[in-house]
Amino acid sequence: SLVGSEMCIRDRLKKYGITHCVLSAGSRNVPFVHSIEEDPEFHCYSVVDERSAGYFALGLAQELNQPVVISCTSSTATCNYWPPVAEAFYQGVPIVVLTSDRDPEMLGQWEDQMIDQVGMYDRHVRKSVNLPIINNHDDEIYCQRLVNEALMELNHHGTGPVHINVPMKSYNNSFNVKTLPEVTKFDRLCLDDSDALWKEKIEKLKKAKRILVTCGQGSFVSSALQESLNEFFKKYNSAVSVEYMSNIEIEEGLNLNVCMDARYVIPKKVKEFLPDIVISFGGNIFAGIKEQFRKFAGEFEHWLVQ
């Protein structure tokens, strides 16, 4: 079943270990506020005035040395966050700014108090995303991606605030959802990260029964890369997908552009051969495998190498 964007945010905050929330309760952020107040993993602080709440969160984040959430209702209430958000940006303090919003279709139509909140903090946040209203599975996956992208920027090459705008047509105050689906957390792994983090990935490769490496478009492929692919293929018994535009020659390589056309392969058959891990690199992938795998988002791990 589909979950609202506020639930999507809540569960990803937990995955990232962000559990301190400074709340300025209003009508539009009721679903988020109530859901975290009822969750024992969250630490909630009520500060009615949004400007004061922002500065309180800034000090709290500095004291805890970890990100803190601020949440408010829609419209001009969001403008009160401006001073503390600017302060957090220039001090490099990680704050998750959650602004509830109204139906985007009603912008400029004399909707009560409605203002344009998309990207409102502009160059004073490290990342700003505007969530979709969730009506189907694709909306849900898109929402998950945007929340992950925002939270990852809290501490990527520096620290600072991020902005997540949460539009809604109306808010659900029935609170009758008992369980939520497992959520996906994005991880970023860099060459200079600890050996322990890299060993975790190695262990996953060892345990995986099906590994697929997809080679995207590339104009120059070094002999070292081709040798590495051959070694990886032999060591992990993986499948390697290459296309004409990949410009990679591997004896055991598969051209999935030929055998994975969505017009001829039904989802049921794709699911039978779904990999445990997909590792992709290079440029664009022309094969219909992208469209096929999107139907099973969350059922396998995807490692993007850049």
Per-region residue spans from a language model:
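Short, small-residue-biased leader/transition segments that mark boundaries at the very start
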Residues: 2-8
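Glycine-rich phosphate/diphosphate-binding loops that line cofactor/substrate pockets in enzymes
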Residues: 10-18, 60-65, 151-158, 197-212, ...
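Thiamine diphosphate
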Residues: 30-104, 274-277, 282, 286
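Conserved thiamine diphosphate
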Residues: 66, 113-160
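Hydrophobic or amphipathic alpha-helical targeting/insertion segments
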Residues: 78-79, 85-128, 157, 161
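Glycine-rich, anion-gripping cofactor-binding loops and their flanking helix/strand elements
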Residues: 80, 215-305
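Glycine-rich beta-alpha junction loops
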Residues: 102, 166-172, 217-219, 246
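Conformationally flexible catalytic loops at phosphate/diphosphate-handling active centers
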Residues: 146-149, 153-208
